[in-house]
Amino acid sequence: MFAVIRTGGKQYRVTPNAVLKVEKLEAEPGSTITFTDVLAVGGEGNLTIGAPVVAGASVTATVIAQDRLDKIVVFKKRRRQNSRRKNGHRQHVTVLRVGDIVAA
């Protein structure tokens, strides 16, 4: 069974026991999060697509850790003008383990 959920402005295809890195969510490690923005649920040859969400469907996940991704370097240079700028940042993410997928 699989589901497509929406969180942080992105869509993720999840299966039970999958480990997933999503945009930072305000939750402590060990806590449980329920996603109700389920866009599609499928498995065993059937697929339910929501318009825009599947009514009554939900996905639960457990927070494993709050982490940061590798550094992204942003470098801008203007040729022949001795002008350059270097910035960087590390994106905050929440690491989740998907639990149950409940279809309507």
Swiss-Prot record:
Stated name of the protein:
Large ribosomal subunit protein bL21
Q: Which UniProt keywords apply?
A: Ribonucleoprotein, Ribosomal protein, RNA-binding, rRNA-binding
Q: Name one GO molecular function term.
A: structural constituent of ribosome
* GO cellular component entries: cytoplasm; ribonucleoprotein complex; ribosome
Task: List, alphabetically, the PANTHER family matched.
Answer: 50S RIBOSOMAL PROTEIN L21 (PTHR21349), LARGE RIBOSOMAL SUBUNIT PROTEIN BL21M (PTHR21349:SF0)
Highest taxon, organism lineage: Bacteria
Assembly notes: Part of the 50S ribosomal subunit. Contacts protein L20.
What InterPro entries does its record include?
bL21-like (IPR028909), bL21-like_sf (IPR036164), Ribosomal_bL21 (IPR001787)
The family database entries (HAMAP family) matched by this protein are listed as: Ribosomal_bL21
Keyword Lyase belongs to the record: no
What Pfam families does the annotation carry?
Answer: Ribosomal_L21p
Name the Gene Ontology biological process terms: translation
Protein family per UniProt: Belongs to the bacterial ribosomal protein bL21 family.
User: What biological function has been recorded for the protein in this entry?
Assistant: This protein binds to 23S rRNA in the presence of protein L20.
